[in-house]
Design a protein with these regions (language model features):
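Non-catalytic accessory segments flanking P-loop/AAA+ NTPase cores
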Residues: 1-443
Length: 443
């Protein structure tokens, strides 16, 4: 399947494999992502004039808001970051400032580009790693030896490399030089402080950045892979490409946008900093320049997708300027009992398939009767109605409860085929779901 140039129809067909229903949401987002590709095909002067149409997704938790955006960004290999609006504070308050979401996007973009470059050089990196380990295992060739000896050494080296590739020497130990583990730097601090931190770390580690370690050949492969990757990759080019890609095709998903809306019903009881966060967010969404450790990035061509349940507030409770920056609005449907059943049976990587694969590792074959699946869907739906509606996430907890004993005693069932029946599902869940006081314990 093509990547960046996927058509809206192809995008929706791909999403249908993983997410049931939500046709309108899929359609709107597919068009928005396709427009990213269309814009990049235009002349530079016209590209600058076309800004993305940001999207506001309205729907309860667990109905697929995040999953739709995340799946598209993944298949199209676009820089993507998901953040929660409620985690940010107004400038001047203790907490994360809104610009850090752009810095997170750039970090993800650089990592994405780096992994792509590593994949292209994969064979070259592996060859260099194998050769280096083989030379460590073979005694070095003395100076001034004959051509015949040199040829013998080359043949021995080749045989040694073949044995390393086949894993025959994985348990052998060798001494290699590896780079010291770098100190973690908090990427949420302002770029100026980041640069100072990096310079201080470089200064103190310059002379003693490598240490000798005795590792197994298997461990050495991984350790050397990272080192050789750094020498073969053009770090500066990767940073520049990552910055450029974040700027032209980055996607920021802002969840819980409703948590910073100031509800007119609550009036003065609302946290005054909520409106402050909205005002800080406004220039980022409108288009501004944000400094990152990789350089400056303009935000006007980043696609922003905001999402929220809006149970206690309305989209109109957001400040008017911010509302105007999210012109496309999509309402997602709540999950019905039928959709719950389809999620369990029709998605490509359904929860049932996941649990079957996990237990197969222990040699346990699990099969679900259709009536059992329908009962799971029914009881999960009922739990959502009686308690807080958490959408498809409820299915995880109900299935976990049904399979709890089998998972715990998996070694006792090894080599057996187990069928999950409607009666078993009822015995594990029905009492809990029937008692409204206990529903909350099924999350």
């Amino acid at each position: 399947m093509s990547k960046l140039n996927m058509t809206p129809r192809e995008i929706v067909a791909y999403l249908d494999e993983y997410i049931i229903g939500q046709k309108e949401a899929k359609k709107s987002i597919a068009i928005a992502f396709r427009n990213r590709y269309r814009r990049l095909q235009l002349e530079k002067s016209l590209q600058e004039e076309i800004t993305p149409k940001n999207i506001l997704m309205i729907g309860s938790t667990g109905v697929g808001k995040t999953e739709i955006a995340r799946r598209i960004a993944k298949i199209m290999e676009l820089p993507f970051v998901k953040v929660e609006a409620s985690k940010y504070t107004e400038v001047g308050f203790v907490g994360r400032d809104v610009e850090s979401m752009v810095r997170d996007l750039v970090n993800n973009s650089v990592l994405l580009v780096e992994n792509e470059h590593k994949e292209k050089l994969k064979d070259k990196i592996e060859e260099a790693v194998i050769e280096k380990i083989a030379k460590k295992l073979l005694p070095p060739l003395p100076n001034g030896v004959s051509e015949e000896k040199k040829q013998e050494y080359a043949n021995s080296l080749l045989k040694m490399q073949q044995r390393i590739v086949q894993g025959e020497l994985d348990s052998r130990e060798i001494e290699i030089e590896v780079r010291k583990k770098s100190i973690e730097i908090d990427s949420n601090v302002p770029p100026e402080i980041l640069r100072v931190q990096e310079n201080v770390i470089k200064f103190f580690h310059k002379e003693q950045d490598k240490v000798k370690k005795t590792l197994s050949v298997k461990e050495a492969k991984e350790a050397l892979k990272a080192e050789i990757s750094d020498t073969l990759l053009d770090g500066e080019a990767i940073k520049m490409e990552g910055l450029k890609r974040a700027e032209s095709s980055g996607v920021i998903f802002i969840d819980e946008i409703d948590k910073i809306a100031v509800s007119s019903k609550e009036g003065g009881r609302q946290d005054p900093s909520k409106e402050g966060v909205q005002r800080d967010l406004l220039p980022i969404v409108e288009g501004s320049v944000v400094n990152t450790k990789y350089g400056s990035i303009k935000t006007e061509h980043i696609l922003f997708i905001a999402a929220g349940a809006f149970h206690l507030s309305k989209p109109s409770d957001l400040i008017p300027e911010l509302q105007g920056r999210f012109p496309l609005r999509v309402e997602l449907e709540n999950l019905t009992e039928e959709i719950m059943y389809m999620i369990l049976t029709q998605t490509k990587t359904s929860i049932i398939k996941q649990y079957q694969a996990l237990l197969k590792v222990e040699g346990v074959e699990i099969a679900f009767e259709d009536d059992a699946i329908k009962e799971l869907a029914k009881l999960s739906y009922n739990a959502n109605q009686k308690s807080e509606d958490i959408g498809a996430r409820r299915l995880h907890t109900t299935i976990e409860k049904v399979l709890e004993d089998i998972s715990f005693e998996a070694e006792d069932y090894s080599g057996q085929n187990i069928t999950i029946t409607k009666e078993l599902v009822q015995s594990k869940l029905e009492d809990l779901v029937a008692d409204e006081n206990l529903v909350k314990y099924i999350l």
